[in-house]
């Protein structure tokens, strides 16, 4: 079996390096050394070494709740984490145990990895898979990650592998001085993998990368959960910051589409998912997201802004009885770029569509601010300094100051 997987494993590492996701030799060596296929029993080795996320557990309604993350974003986050030999690392979200194994390789025999998951079955499976892969130095614990794991603190590095709505105080409190916390932070529905450094009285971002993860469950669960729309299985709306919305009215509006507007603005998929999505989230409190899964895609209610296998998603402005959603690409657009459109739904949908189009043009006119220049500072909720030049997002525990 070793000979069978060496080639596809090496090919994956080369692919990640060529794309810029792997940038250091120690991260490359971790991916070469750790056998992903042993953490995905039942998956063909060739599939295990594809640069794709693989769902490993679903809820009864079909929504995925655990997976082996896409290697590209795993590599990005490990580069952000900047793990050194001998360090103590806390991971929130064990999943299959593959990422914990990569971390164990990075810290070496003088370091230690503690990994937490809320599901007993996942922890037990991960323990077995770590043992089968010959990985030592990992303590896999069934616990709610919101509280961290005080027994192993302080940690030089903390990494969260599920989308976090807030920065939990326990993660910060268990982080060593000048330690680093990497987490997929949800900002009104847009996810960013943020590498924070712990300073005297706050966390300061050192790098930001767009990402997409399943949400944390348990005490730190995101109130921006997907809400089902109507009686169509697989149709959901993500509401920002627990915004009150008449879901039945939105479902009715989706059955009343209007004529699509064109913005004339050409974009790439990455720009839509991250840069434009973040601009809308920060500039309009009515921004939200529509998602269709499985058979709901065929109902053609959600404009196919971005499509993944088994899922279609778009960003929208949500009104009381109407909405407007970003739409595209059309079939004649080149694969790497398309002109974005705006589709109104329901009464007053045209007004929302014009407002949404204005945001697209404003983002374009501002030079399409990217995550490379994004700065995020996280303070305890009531301890942040006044800074009128920043966007301010308040969470239950944290005040985020955001600027480009």
Which residues fall in each region the model found?
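C-terminal target-recognition/interaction regions appended to catalytic cores
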Residues: 300-404
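Class I SAM-dependent transferase core
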Residues: 1-95, 99-102, 106, 122, ...
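Conserved nucleotide-cofactor-binding alpha/beta core module
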Residues: 79-182, 186-193
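Residues that form generic nucleotide/phosphate-binding pockets
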Residues: 15, 30, 253, 355, ...
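Short, ordered beta-strand-loop transition motifs
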Residues: 58-60, 199-200, 330-335
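Class I SAM-binding transferase module
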Residues: 165-311, 400-403
């Amino acid at each position: 079996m070793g000979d069978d997987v060496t080639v596809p494993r090496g090919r994956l590492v080369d692919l990640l390096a060529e794309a810029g996701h792997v940038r250091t030799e120690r991260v490359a060596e971790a991916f070469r050394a750790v056998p992903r296929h042993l953490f995905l029993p039942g998956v063909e080795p060739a599939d295990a070494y594809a640069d794709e996320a693989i769902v490993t557990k679903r809820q009864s309604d079909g929504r995925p709740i655990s997976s082996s993350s896409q290697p590209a974003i795993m590599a990005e986050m490990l580069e952000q984490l900047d793990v050194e030999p001998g360090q103590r690392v806390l991971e929130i979200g064990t999943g299959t145990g593959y990422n914990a194994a990569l971390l164990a390789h990075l810290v070496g025999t003088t370091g230690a990895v503690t990994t937490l998951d809320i599901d007993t079955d996942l922890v037990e499976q991960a323990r077995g898979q770590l043992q089968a892969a010959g990985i030592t130095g990992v303590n896999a614990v069934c616990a709610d990650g919101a509280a961290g794991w005080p027994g192993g603190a302080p940690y030089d590095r903390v990494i969260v592998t599920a989308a976090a709505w807030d920065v939990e105080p326990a993660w910060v409190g268990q982080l060593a001085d000048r330690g680093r916390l990497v987490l997929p932070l949800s900002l009104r529905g847009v996810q960013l993998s943020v590498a924070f450094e712990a300073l005297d009285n706050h966390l300061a971002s050192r790098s930001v990368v767009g990402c997409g993860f399943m949400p944390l469950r348990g005490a730190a669960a995101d109130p921006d959960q997907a809400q089902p729309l109507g009686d169509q299985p697989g149709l959901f709306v993500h509401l920002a910051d627990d915004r009150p919305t008449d879901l039945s009215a939105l479902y009715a509006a989706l059955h009343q589409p209007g004529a699509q507007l064109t913005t004339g603005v050409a974009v790439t998929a990455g720009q839509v998912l991250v840069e434009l999505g973040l601009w809308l989230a920060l500039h309009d409190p009515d921004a939200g997201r529509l998602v269709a899964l499985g058979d709901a895609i065929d109902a053609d209610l959600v404009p196919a802004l971005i499509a993944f296998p088994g899922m279609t998603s778009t960003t929208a402005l949500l009104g009381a009885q109407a909405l407007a959603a970003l739409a595209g690409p059309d079939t004649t657009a080149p694969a790497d770029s398309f002109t974005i459109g705006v589709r109104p739904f329901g009464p007053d949908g045209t007004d929302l569509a014009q407002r949404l189009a204005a945001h697209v043009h404003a983002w374009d006119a501002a030079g399409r601010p990217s995550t490379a220049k994004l700065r995020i500072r996280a303070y305890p909720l009531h301890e942040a300094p006044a800074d009128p030049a920043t966007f301010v997002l308040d969470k239950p525990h944290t005040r985020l100051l955001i600027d480009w």
